[in-house]
A protein has these predicted regions:
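Extracellular loop-to-transmembrane helix junctions
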Residues: 15-39, 52, 81-125, 205, ...
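Conserved small/polar residues in nucleotide/adenosyl-binding loops
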Residues: 392-395
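Helix-loop-helix module between adjacent transmembrane segments
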Residues: 91-186, 254-261, 343-351
Length: 395
C-alpha cells in the first residue's frame, strides 16, 4: 500500500511556514535522538544490524510490524477511497489486514526457527540453507529486490507531496530531505533504530488520527447524526453499503492474496526473523487485528463523513479530505500535525523497506567477503537514491 502519484497530490492547506517548521523540526529531532540511542548498543555484526540481535519482544514486534505495514495510504489513501466508495472499504482494509495475523502466526514461527537454524537473515538465505542451491538464492533475492524497488521509490514521492502541502514548495525538496533523514537514522542504528522510530511514528500517527476523528465526529453532531445524514440523502446513502463495490468474489480473493503475500514482504519477513521467541510472535499475531481496526477506522470514517461538508470532490480532492476536514475543526496546527502523521506512516514503511532490501543485496547478491560496514552503508545509500531519481523520469 502506498500513496497515489502526483495526480492525487495534497493541495497546500494554508498552514503557516512557522507552524510547519516547528512541527516538522520537532519530529525530525525526535527521530535523530532515537537513532543515537539505538547506536549505543549496536553490535558490529549483521545479526545486530539487520535483526537487532533477534531480540524483538511481543509488544515491540507488534508495534514495528504494524508501523511497517501501514504506509501513507493508511492516512490519506484510505480516507480518499472511503469518500468515493463508502464504509464498505473498512472491512476490506481492517479485516483483511488483520486476517494476515493468521499467516504471520503459522508461518512466523517456522520462519524464526529456520532462520536461527541456518543463521539466515533473509528468505533467500533460508532457501539456500534448506536446499543448498545458490542459484535458488540468487533468483529469489533478485525477484524480491525487483518487486520492492518500485514501492521503495514511491515513499519519497509521497513525502514530497506532504512537504509541498506543508510549505508550498516543489515536491522534490521534501523527497530529498526525508530521504536524507531516513538514511541517517537507518545507517546510524540499523533495525534497532528503525524499530524505535517505528514506535514513535506509530504512536504519533495513531494518536493524531483518533484525535482528529473525535473532533470531526463531534463537529458533525455525533456518529449517529452523521450516519443518519448520510443515509437520508439519495446522493450518499450508497456509502453505507457495499452494493456495486465489493462482491463476495472480490472480497475473498483479496483476503487470500494478502494472507499469503504479505508475510513475504522483505521488511515483514525480516521482523519475524528478529523475533525473540515463538511466544513473541504469538502475542504479536493475537493483537495485530485490533491494531489494524484502530488504524483504519479513523481515516475511513472521516472520509465518509467528509461528504457532508464537501459533497462534490474529484479523485484528487478526495485524497485531500482527511487533512481538510481536520483543519476545518482543529485549525492549522492540528492540520499540520495530521500531515506529519502521514509523514510518520510513510517513513516507518520507507526505512523498513530500505533496511530489508539492503539486507537482500548485501547478504544474498553481493560477495560476502566484502567489508561489512562499508558494504551495508554503500548499498543503503544507493537504494535511497531511487526515490529522488524517480522524479527525473516521472515528473
Amino acid at each position: 500500500m502506498g500513496m497515489h502519484s502526483q495526480d492525487n497530490a495534497i493541495a497546500p492547506l494554508g498552514i503557516s511556514v512557522s507552524s510547519a517548521l516547528v512541527i516538522v523540526g520537532g519530529y525530525a529531532l525526535a527521530m535523530v535522538i532515537f537513532a543515537i540511542w539505538a547506536r549505543r548498543d549496536l553490535g558490529r555484526g549483521d545479526e545486530s544490524y539487520y535483526l537487532a540481535g533477534r531480540s524483538l519482544t511481543g509488544p515491540i514486534l507488534l508495534v514495528t510490524m504494524a508501523a511497517t505495514n501501514f504506509s501513507a495510504f493508511t492516512v490519506y489513501g484510505s480516507s480518499g477511497a472511503s469518500y468515493r466508495i463508502g464504509l464498505s472499504f473498512l472491512p476490506i482494509m481492517a479485516f483483511g489486514t488483520g486476517f494476515m495475523a493468521v499467516s504471520m502466526y503459522i508461518l512466523g514461527r517456522k520462519i524464526r526457527s529456520r532462520s536461527v537454524q541456518h543463521g539466515a537473515m533473509t528468505a533467500p538465505e533460508m532457501v539456500m540453507g534448506q536446499t543448498g542451491s545458490r542459484s535458488a538464492q540468487l533468483t529469489m533475492a533478485s525477484v524480491l529486490v525487483l518487486a520492492t524497488i518500485p514501492y521503495l521509490a514511491l515513499q519519497p514521492r509521497a513525502a514530497g507531496i506532504v512537504f509541498s502541502a506543508l510549505f508550498g514548495g516543489p515536491d522534490w525538496i521534501g523527497a530529498v530531505l526525508v530521504t536524507l533523514l531516513v538514511v541517517a537514522y537507518t545507517l546510524t542504528g540499523g533495525l534497532k533504530a528503525v524499530v524505535r522510530t517505528d514506535a514513535v511514528q506509530g504512536a504519533i500517527a495513531l494518536g493524531l488520527l483518533w484525535l482528529g476523528l473525535a473532533m470531526v465526529v463531534n463537529d458533525a453532531g455525533g456518529i449517529s447524526a452523521a450516519m443518519d445524514a448520510i443515509s437520508s440523502s439519495e446522493n450518499t446513502e450508497g456509502l453505507l453499503g457495499r452494493e456495486g463495490n465489493y462482491t463476495l468474489l472480490i472480497w475473498v480473493s483479496t483476503m487470500i492474496l494478502w494472507l499469503f503475500a504479505d508475510p513475504m514482504f522483505p521488511q515483514l519477513y525480516q521482523r519475524l526473523c528478529a523475533a525473540e521467541s515463538d511466544a513473541a510472535i504469538g502475542r504479536m499475531a493475537t493483537l495485530y487485528p485490533t491494531v489494524a481496526w484502530l488504524a483504519f477506522l479513523p481515516p475511513i470514517l472521516i472520509g465518509t463523513i467528509g461528504h457532508l461538508s464537501y459533497p462534490d470532490l474529484d479523485r484528487a480532492g478526495s485524497d485531500n479530505i482527511l487533512p481538510t476536514m481536520i483543519m476545518d475543526v482543529g485549525g492549522e496546527w492540528l492540520g499540520g500535525l495530521v500531515l506529519v502523521a502521514g509523514l510518520a506512516a510513510l517513513m516507518s514503511t520507507m526505512d523498513s523497506q530500505l533496511l530489508a532490501t539492503g539486507s537482500l543485496v548485501t547478504r544474498d547478491l553481493l560477495d560476502k567477503e566484502s567489508p561489512g560496514d562499508r558494504s551495508r552503508e554503500s548499498v543503503i545509500i544507493s537504494l535511497s537514491l531511487l526515490g529522488p531519481v524517480s522524479y527525473t523520469h516521472l515528473t
